[in-house]
C-alpha cells in the first residue's frame, strides 16, 4: 500500500515544484519590464524616449515640400533638411508624426525599411537577422520546445493503462483536464481577443463602438465551431470504427440480437427473462456438453467484454481528438516562435522560454490522455513527437509570411482570426467530454482529493504562465 501511494505523492511534489519555478520566473521577470521590453523590440523605442522626443523643442526648415501624409510613410531626412509643421507635437529632426511612432522606417543618416520590424533602439545591439540565421534560430527553438517535454515523459512511472498504474494515471488525467481548460480560457481565447481590444494603431481617444463587437462575436463563434467540429469528428469516427458497437452497450441487448434469428417479436414484453432463456437454449443446442456452466460463464462475461470493447473504442476516439487539438495548438506555438524571431532575437528567446514553460505541463497531460486511450508509453511518446510537425509548420508559415503584426501567439491576423479560438473549442470538448467523465469513477476519498488537487494544479499552472505572457 505504501508503494501505491508513493507515485501520486511523487507527482504532487513534482507539480508543486513546477509551480514554484513558475512563480520564481514570474517574480523575476515582472509584467512591467516584459511590457517595456516587448514595446522596445516591436517599435524600437521606449515610452521614456518618446516622451523626451515630444518635448525636444528643435525646429528645422524643410525644403522638399513633403505633405503630412508623406511623413506617415517613414520618409527620413538629414539634419540639414527640416520642416516646420505646426500640427506636429514635436520638432525632432526626423520629422516623424505622432502616428509614425508605431513604425520604425526612419534613421539619423540612412534609411531603413523593415516592414514593421527592425533594430532595437538600444545602441550596439543588432536585432534584425539575416535569412539563414533567422530560420536556424526559429526552427531550432521549435525543435527545443518539442523535444524538451518529450524527455520529461521518461520520468513518469506509467507504462500502460493497467490497474497497477490506475491511481497515478487518474491524477495525471485530472491535471490534463485542468491544463486543457486553463489553456483554453486563460491563454487561447484571451490571445484571440487581445488584438481586437488593444490594436497598436488605435487612436488613444477612440471609444468603443458597435463595430468592435463583430470580431469579439466571431471569436465566440469560432470557439463553438471547434466544439461542434470535434463532436462531428467523434461521431464520424465512432460510426466508421464502431459500426455495430452501439448495440453492444448492454448485455441484454446483445443476447436478444443473437436470439432473434429464430423467434418473432413476442419476446419484447419480458426482455430480461427471454434473453436469458435464449442464451440457455443456445447453450443447450450448440454446446450441449457444457450445459449450464457455459451459460453462467457467458452471462457475466459478455456484458463485461462488450463494455470493455465499448470503453476502449471511446477512449481511442478521444485520443485521436486530443492529438488533433494538440496538433493545432502546436501550430499556433510555431506561429508565435517564428513571428517573434522576425521581431528580434531577444524577443524570440523570450517567447521560446514562455512557450516551453507552457508546453511541459501540457505535454504531460496529453501523454496521460493517450495512455488512458489504450496506448503504451512508447506509443504515446511517439505520437507526441508527431505533433511537433504542427509546430514546425507554424514556424515556417510565420517566417514565410510577409508583414503582419507580431503577437505573442500568432503572426499577422491569420492565427488570431480562427486558429486560436477553434483550438480552444477543441480543448474544451476534449476536457469536458473525454477526460472529466473518467474522473467520475468511484474512488477512495484520498484518491478523489488528489484528483481535485491535480485539476486545480493544472489551472494554477496556466494562471502562472498567463502572467508571464
From Swiss-Prot:
Biased composition (Basic and acidic residues): 43-56, 66-114, 295-313
Post-translational modifications reported in the UniProt record: Methylation at some His residue by METTL9 leads to reduced zinc-binding. Rapidly phosphorylated by CK2 following Zn(2+) treatment. This phosphorylation is required for efficient cytosolic Zn(2+) release.
Main location: endoplasmic reticulum
The family this protein is said to belong to: Belongs to the ZIP transporter (TC 2.A.5) family. KE4/Catsup subfamily.
Sites bearing Phosphoserine, chain numbering: 275-276
Positions bearing Pros-methylhistidine: 66
Coiled-coil zones: none
Protein name: Zinc transporter SLC39A7
Summary of the function given for this chain in its UniProt record: Transports Zn(2+) from the endoplasmic reticulum (ER)/Golgi apparatus to the cytosol, playing an essential role in the regulation of cytosolic zinc levels. Acts as a gatekeeper of zinc release from intracellular stores, requiring post-translational activation by phosphorylation, resulting in activation of multiple downstream pathways leading to cell growth and proliferation. Has an essential role in B cell development and is required for proper B cell receptor signaling.
GO molecular function per UniProt: zinc ion transmembrane transporter activity
Catalytic activity field: Zn(2+)(in) = Zn(2+)(out)
Stored Pfam families: Zip
Annotated membrane topology: Multi-pass membrane protein
A single cellular component GO annotation: Golgi apparatus
GO biological process: B cell differentiation; intracellular zinc ion homeostasis; regulation of ferroptosis; skin epidermis development; zinc ion transmembrane transport
Transmembrane segments: 5-25, 138-158, 169-189, 214-234, 386-406, 417-437, 448-468
Region of interest called Disordered, as start-end residue ranges on this chain: 43-122, 242-313
Compositionally biased tracts (Low complexity): 256-266
